[in-house]
């Protein structure tokens, strides 16, 4: 199993942390370039949140 890269994100609590996304996908309108989205879990509150991933992130 390959290790996913850590991404620097701002959590809903306002802190900036390096987290690994639990799930990634591409969100794209029909016929256009999309953006990569990651699902992260806040380590403090346990809440899930979404954040944009860099374009070079493997999906």
Swiss-Prot record:
InterPro entries: Cren7_sf, dsDNA-bd_Cren7. One of its GO terms (cellular component) is cytoplasm. Methylated at multiple sites, to varying extents. Disulfide bonds: none annotated. Keywords: Chromosome, Cytoplasm, DNA-binding, Methylation. It is found in: Chromosome; Cytoplasm. It holds the Pfam family Cren7. One of its GO terms (molecular function) is double-stranded DNA binding. It comes from the Archaea. Belongs to the Cren7 family. Monomer. A chromatin protein, binds double-stranded DNA without sequence specificity. Constrains negative DNA supercoils. This is Chromatin protein Cren7.
């Amino acid at each position: 199993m390959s290790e996913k890269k850590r991404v620097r994100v701002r959590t809903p609590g306002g802190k900036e942390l390096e987290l690994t996304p639990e799930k990634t996908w591409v969100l794209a309108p029909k016929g256009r370039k999309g953006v990569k989205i990651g699902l992260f879990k806040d380590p403090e509150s346990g809440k899930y949140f979404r954040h944009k991933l860099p374009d070079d992130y493997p999906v």
